[in-house]
Amino acid sequence: MAEFNLEALNALPKAEQAAALAVVNGQLEQLSAQERVSWALENLPGDYVLSSSFGIQAAVSLHLVTQQRPDIPVILTDTGYLFPETYQFIDALTEQLKLNLQVYRATESAAWQEARYGKLWEQGVEGIERYNLLNKVEPMNRALSELKAKTWFAGLRREQSGSRGDLPVLAIQRGVFKFLPIIDWDNRTVYQYLKENGLSYHPLWDQGYLSVGDTHTTRKWEPGMSEEETRFFGLKRECGLHEG
């Protein structure tokens, strides 16, 4: 199959983009995650990047993609408020998988932001969205631009939240191809992959965390809570990286 023409697809309205991608998405749904990655590397344009928050199940997509593209840049948007265990997990996975880690941060430090704006995460949905824009969306946009990305791999799964329930394997976001090879995996498949490949969950998994982000907007799971309710005080599920 010939390489997809990103410029031509970007020129189409979103509805027409979706229609153009619908047929290939139907085919991709029938492939294994490994086959999807192979297909993407053969048919989608480089340069390629892989984003990771180094969350609970991050080792899956990091291992899956780097098995076929060892030198792919791995983008981390570091807010400065990650758990100590997350930074330790980043170091451990970077060493274990020999990751080409590329860390991007906000142009203002965490302390400077607090001095200027206060604790944005305590200022309702609007404050959380501004915090995410400063610390996640802008650094990611900068990463995609500086790394000249044309195809962006990510480890999102439909099972993680209602907002991800209808996501396709292949889409266009921010002018680049967005590719989600494990979008249809359930928790059991994740567990089996980790076990078979000698990989670990995030250290906080054993302490009852289902999803891990910043220290101030992540809660330990309690009976009766959904995974979505453990992040951003239940006000939001997405941090903005995978929206729009």
Swiss-Prot record:
Lineage: Bacteria, Pseudomonadati, Pseudomonadota, Gammaproteobacteria, Enterobacterales
Catalytic activity: [thioredoxin]-disulfide + sulfite + adenosine 3',5'-bisphosphate + 2 H(+) = [thioredoxin]-dithiol + 3'-phosphoadenylyl sulfate
CDD domains: PAPS_reductase
Cellular location(s): Cytoplasm
Primary localisation category: cytoplasm
Biological function: Catalyzes the formation of sulfite from phosphoadenosine 5'-phosphosulfate (PAPS) using thioredoxin as an electron donor.
Classification via InterPro entries: PAPS/APS_Rdtase, PAPS_reduct_dom, PAPS_reductase_CysH, Rossmann-like_a/b/a_fold
Organism: Pectobacterium carotovorum subsp. carotovorum (strain PC1)
Family to which the UniProt record says this protein belongs: Belongs to the PAPS reductase family. CysH subfamily.
Gene assigned in the entry: cysH
The protein, known as: Phosphoadenosine 5'-phosphosulfate reductase
Active site: C239 (nucleophile)
GO cellular component: cytoplasm
Keyword RNA-binding: no
UniProt record, GO biological process: hydrogen sulfide biosynthetic process; sulfate assimilation, phosphoadenylyl sulfate reduction by phosphoadenylyl-sulfate reductase (thioredoxin)
